[in-house]
């Protein structure tokens, strides 16, 4: 896509701090470092998000993300890693090109916070019915 920031980076029109590159995948440092070493992994071809990406390409991106996370722990001495991808604006996706954040974690309060809490406004959920609905779609 001509107006996609990540497509422009993948095509070399916008410079980046490249970490890894092959025919299908590019990994580079996020210009907005949440923690030291925060890396983005993208397919070079445009796909809107994780859910729209063909499995072969998604698997290649995940393999690269896994390797980068391992290196961040080994060589940057991170204590852990968050690997995540937001799908759609409502889930926090701001650039509509599939990308995986690989965020090394050094200590609590290091600049990144991901919290999940039980939503008490959803009482009396019928979990078997919800599970059945999802199962039917698989």
PLM features per residue range, with description:
Residues 1-138:
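HIT superfamily nucleotide-processing domains
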């Amino acid at each position: 896509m001509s107006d996609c920031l990540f497509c422009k980076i993948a095509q070399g029109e916008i410079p980046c701090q490249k970490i890894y590159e092959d025919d299908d995948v590019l990994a580079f440092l996020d210009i907005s470092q949440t923690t030291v070493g925060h890396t983005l992994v993208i397919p070079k071809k445009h796909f809107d998000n994780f859910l729209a990406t063909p499995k072969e390409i998604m698997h290649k991106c995940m393999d690269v993300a896994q390797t980068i996370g391992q290196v961040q722990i080994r060589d940057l001495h991170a204590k852990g890693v968050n690997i995540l991808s937001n799908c759609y604006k409502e889930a926090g996706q701001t650039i509509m090109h599939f990308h995986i954040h690989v965020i090394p974690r050094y200590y609590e309060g290091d600049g990144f916070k991901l919290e999940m809490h039980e939503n008490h406004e959803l009482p009396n959920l019928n979990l078997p019915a919800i599970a059945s609905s999802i199962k039917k779609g698989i």
